[in-house]
Swiss-Prot record:
It comes from the Bacteria. It comes from Chlorobaculum parvum (strain DSM 263 / NCIMB 8327) (Chlorobium vibrioforme subsp. thiosulfatophilum). Monomer. Its main location: cytoplasm. This is Elongation factor Tu.
Length: 393
């Protein structure tokens, strides 16, 4: 049977469900697929099928994530749901599932709980652009309590820097929707309308400023130096001016040739593995870990704040805690750079399995911006992961 071609007639958006354990994230994910399946916009997925999510490895970390696809009249969605709380934290920090927006699920019977707060904070830290709230289990909650829960939620969202007064809060019962109850199904359709309208359409990678991390360097006698790598974003054309950023002082050059699979091209774009021939650049001046980018689009830095997750011993991480001044390697894009860690005030040590905010100072500058992900390594072994939350200098 011929494979169905992927139709690009609708914008593609990545979303996920977040929230406290047992508040109904997976039930909601199953309900969305079952309701949309009735109009042929999804394949219905069972709760149990989503709940026993396969394990994946991202930056050396094993994460269980369920991927579900569906569409509305306006968009095509890829939706992720994680069975365990630790999986959520790892997912958000490693960016394994980059979210353009998220549905925060809160049980109306409980209101915001510790993980609700933690997921909102993480969403803020790793720059999830927008949240929509699904207030679940409203069929078994006291209506007066629901009003209080909604107020409390709006305050909590505002406290963490989201527009709490404007965020859509949809009330419903995911379980009833899953069981085919018309009221339940109506709430799911309302939720999808809110997601369509409130979660902004992401800028496609090709529309962003050009950037390619350097993986390897060659010199072609009589022609110059070639940097190879996978183009992370944007488009590059022969004759474009670029900057070489990171590790050493920033230099400028011009792309005089683009090669892909031994063929010469006029342009390369996001996702392509390409070799860029650079005018007037010595082979020694280019090395793995640098990036070739649109001039002025990215700058090199050594000091930043980050949200990090430290692997548990069972996940192949450290067996012992670390302390202030810990000096591992930070793996950005294609290379390791040593850096020292400063712990927040009042934190004496970090145990395997912890997630927290830290300050880092690298021994060499790396091209970086907020939301850039990295792995924390010791001698090539991954012991943690992080996301840049703020550049200091």
């Amino acid at each position: 049977m011929a494979k169905e071609s992927y139709k690009r007639d609708k914008p593609h958006v990545n979303i996920g469900t977040i929230g406290h354990v047992d508040h109904g994230k997976t039930t909601l994910t199953a309900a969305i697929t079952s309701v949309l399946a009735k109009s042929g916009k999804a394949a219905a997925r069972e709760f149990g099928d989503i709940d026993k999510a396969p394990e994946e490895r991202e930056r050396g970390i094993t994460i269980s994530t369920a991927h579900v696809e569906y569409q509305t009249d306006k968009r095509h969605y890829a939706h992720i749901d994680c069975p365990g709380h630790a999986d959520y934290i790892k997912n958000m920090i490693t960016g394994a599932a980059q979210m353009d927006g998220a549905i925060l699920v809160v049980a109306g019977t409980d209101g915001p709980m510790p993980q609700t707060r933690e997921h909102i904070l993480l969403a803020r830290q790793v720059n999830v652009p927008a949240l929509v709230v699904f207030l679940n289990k409203v069929d078994i909650a006291d209506p007066e309590l629901l009003e209080l829960v909604e107020m409390e939620l709006r305050e909590l969202l505002t406290e963490y820097g989201f527009p709490g007064d404007d965020i859509p809060i949809i009330k419903g019962s995911a379980l009833n929707a899953l069981n085919g109850d018309p009221e339940g199904e109506k709430a799911i359709m309302e939720l999808m309308d809110a997601v369509d309208d409130y979660i902004p359409e992401p800028v496609r990678d090709v529309d962003k400023p050009f950037l390619m991390p350097v993986e390897d360097v060659f010199s072609i006698s009589g022609r110059g130096t070639v940097g190879t790598g996978r183009i992370e974003r944007g488009i590059i054309k022969v004759g474009n001016e670029v900057e070489i950023v990171g590790i050493k002082p920033t230099t400028k050059s011009v792309v005089t040739g683009i090669e892909m699979f031994q063929k010469t091209l006029d342009e390369g774009q996001a996702g392509d593995n390409a070799g860029l021939l650079l005018r007037g650049v010595d082979k020694e001046a280019l090395e793995r870990g640098m990036v070739i980018a649109k001039p002025g689009s990215i700058t090199p830095h050594t000091k930043f704040k980050a949200e990090v997750y430290i692997l548990k011993k069972e996940e192949g991480g450290r067996h012992t805690p670390f302390f202030n001044g810990y000096r591992p390697q930070f793996y950005f894009r294609t290379t390791d750079v040593t850096g020292s860690v400063t712990l927040p005030e009042g934190v004496e040590m970090v145990m395997p399995g912890d997630n927290l905010s830290v300050d880092v100072e690298l021994i060499a500058p790396i091209a970086m911006e907020e939301s850039l992900r990295f792995a924390i390594r010791e001698g090539g072994r991954t012991v943690g992961a992080g996301s840049v939350t703020k550049i200091v200098e």
